[in-house]
Amino acid sequence: KIRAMELIDDVERDARGPYCGAIGRIGSDGDAAFNVAIRTIRLTPGENDKHKAVLGVGGAIVADSDGMGEWRECLIKSAFVRGRAGGHDLIETMRFDPEEGIALLEPHLERMKASAAELGFAFDRHDARNRIQALCFELEEAAKLRLMLTRSGAIALEVQALPEALGEPATCLALPHPTVAGDWRLRHKTTDRNFYEEALAMAQAAGAKEALLVREDGQLTEGCWTSIFVERDGILLTPPLELGLLPGVLRRSLIEEGRAREAALSLSDLEGGFLIGNALRGLIPAKVITP
């Protein structure tokens, strides 16, 4: 037993947690009840802040065990959870230009790879890049390119005309944030965008082009399809990711270039003018309107 645990410590990257041990209770009268903790979902405060739970799955590996067979056993044991996973897809929306191609292709693929790893999607980044590049060779005009990824790893590409210009300044309506900062949907670009769509519909009904989401503490997070920027002393300020918002590709590019940095923003910070933007449209001057 001791030697086995020494070997496990050498070859396994992470601690196994409680799933391969026992869990139980001891009453004040000395009565005890214990059971193994397999098929037990562990939820800790730190993980719950990110709306994330952990399920440990494994098997009894012996000298003649087959690696693929053990992996199939793990899939069978975890099927009761995996079968209930959300039916959403991951998406990336990119801008194709005949002269420049897709300028931010690698950051788009990197974001999808990170989301796929965290949410349990299969993703072949090399294959996705090759298929995008092959499609771009067929395009002659600027276009909107949408990459979609299913949980199983299937990729789909859509080409659409670029959206019409919004006009400047683009009108925005401030609305209460519809969810909590720990909602996983804020950190990943998926087809599960109902709360964004509802907020945007409210803004459009009031005559605005975009909705600005405001937390209960008054801090701005993002728009429904854009990041928010305020220029101060030649630097663009944009809300921090920790507040609960999408890590936008344009946003990341501007930060890495030294043109932007994270800072807390409220509606009062927008009074002198601000910008909204994404990788498809670039930066757009904007203003807040009242309903």
Locate predicted features:
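Conserved hydrophobic core element of enzyme catalytic domains
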Residues: 1-86
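Helix-start/capping segments and mature chain N-termini
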Residues: 36, 45, 66-144, 148-291
